[in-house]
Amino acid sequence: MADIGIVGENEYVEKGQEAKLIKRLGFSKCRLSLAIPKDEEYKGAEWFEGKTIATSYPAILRSFLEERGVKADIHVISGSVEIAPGIGLADAIFDIVSSGSTLVSNQLREVEVVLPCEALLIANNNLSKEKLEILDELLFRFEAIQVAEGKKYVLLNAPKEKLDEIIEVLPGMKSPTITPLANDEWVSVQSVIAEKHFWETVSYTHLRAHETEADL
């Protein structure tokens, strides 16, 4: 048995969660959904009453149906679940959906999202002290990458007289780093900002510096 592993949440939930969930990793996001023929009218989970549903995830599907009080036949198949309605094996499917293009190509439409999924870091419940220390180090590295995701490192030179204005829009993760330059009237500013605000922030700081230069 492995000490640690990265698995899809769909597999982790379906197989009974024997390993310990350590961390959600935030990538390979998808969902386990119910889909029916695109021309069928759908008003709720009762549509599945008495129907046959093809899936590779019977445990998760069974739990969902029981919660909704729906009785349906579960037809377990491995792979190519999406073709089951088209060849008469099932009335609907319960499968992994990402973009939804596979459903469209098989004349199906998504009607119920049962379980949003992503990659999970899991571990054996009986790790030794030494292995737990290694796991902690690995977690530190994973978390560093996750924190850095969607961030930009910005390095710019700015006039001292505009520094307070620039810091207002360039705060950094805690505080920007300010370094003196050979020209006493200017400083170097280093910061980390959200990528989605990168251009508006850079444009603002550039404008402030440009206005100052024009006044010199």
Range-by-range predicted roles:
Residues 20-71, 126-128, 139-140:
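A conserved helix-loop-strand patch within extracytoplasmic ligand-binding domains
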Residues 205, 209-212:
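Conserved small/polar residues in nucleotide/adenosyl-binding loops
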Residues 13-24, 101-116:
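Ligand-binding "clamshell"
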Residues 28-34, 116-121, 152:
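Small-molecule pocket liners
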Residues 2-12, 94-101, 160:
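Beta->alpha turn/N-cap motifs
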Residues 146-159:
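Short glycine-/aliphatic-rich beta-strand segments at the starts of folded cytosolic domains
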Residues 74-85:
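Short helix-initiation/N-cap motifs at beta->coil->alpha
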Residues 158-176:
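Short amphipathic alpha-helix segments
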